[in-house]
Amino acid sequence: LIQVNWDGETVWRFDRTELVEAEGEDPTWMARQHHDWQREGSPAGYYAPGAEPLVDRGRTLILSRREVLRPEITDKLLLDDYIVEVAWDGDVVWEWLPSDHVEEFGFSEAARNAIYRFPGWNETRGSAEWLHINSMSYVGPNRWYEGGDERFHPDNVLWGSRDANVIGITDRSGAIVWRMGPDYRDHPALAELGQIIGQHHPHIIPEGLPGAGYLLVFDNG
């Protein structure tokens, strides 16, 4: 992941997620990022009053990948999403693997059984992408936290799993403290909303914009 200035000069880079060894090549450090990243200061990833991304300091959230073995999920090699937060100097200051928290996803027994047998195996890749998280962001300042709801702490991380149809918030302990899905029959309000399928870019609308504090999400289904 590289940041360049308007003169095309590299002012920041990060590639130290994993040392990858390919046959016939020297080991190479890679970030293994996919889909999303975010710089501190801009929780939604687009312009909002007083919410400009820091360009010469600050933390960066990166959505990456990591292969893991989790026999309680499946007997196949998992390609897990890996959210890592790095300081400006490249030090890893926080990290999260969803597979460590499978019991917090709200999967039914039938869903767990289906995931175990059919976790999204890719023969070419040799691993199973079981969640396909395609977005993550800081929660950012919001009225829910200001009203006393710690689940919506601005530094907590909001993410969306396309394949599991889950939107969640993870706090700094790693716990999933707020969740919508996968079963939208769990609560009358969710049943009225209806099933969200293959969602993209769930985020809290920033302060200073219409609808501030509400969750905005693209329903892909």
Sequence positions of predicted segments:
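Histidine-/acidic-rich catalytic cores in large beta-rich domains
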Residues: L1-G221
